[in-house]
Amino acid sequence: MRPTVILTCAAAAHAQIFGNFFNQMLKKEFAVEESWHNQEYHKVSCDNGHVCPDTLTCVNSPLECPCQFPASEIKCVYPDKSGYVCISKPGDGYDGSDASSKAEDGKRDCAWVNKAFRGEL
């Protein structure tokens, strides 16, 4: 019985050391990316406008911000115009950006986003 307890404790200690090592590495990597993004954000010259946080694009208002990956995302503006969300385009080629279209079951498009916004899902 004692060897089982010793092996269990050793395995737990090893897992904790291993987990801590990678957790510290991830924290450092994220801090570097965040620091770089903040530096780039502050470099953007945008007089009398708004800098989009995801794309660092200068626009007149936050609702004009483009999606970060326009080839694979569609931008859906909330019904009350308080913001927007970029979602993956449906795989069938339909761009799904028409918020007035009828939301089809299982299809994630702007009509679906509007239903979710209103709490109808």
UniProtKB/Swiss-Prot annotation:
Residues 1-15 form the signal peptide. Keywords: Signal. Belongs to the LCL2 family. PANTHER family: LONG CHRONOLOGICAL LIFESPAN PROTEIN 2 (PTHR38425:SF1). It comes from Yarrowia lipolytica (strain CLIB 122 / E 150) (Yeast). This is Long chronological lifespan protein 2. It comes from the Eukaryota. Probable component of the endoplasmic reticulum-associated degradation (ERAD) pathway. CDD domains: LCL2-like (cd23996). InterPro entries: LCL2.
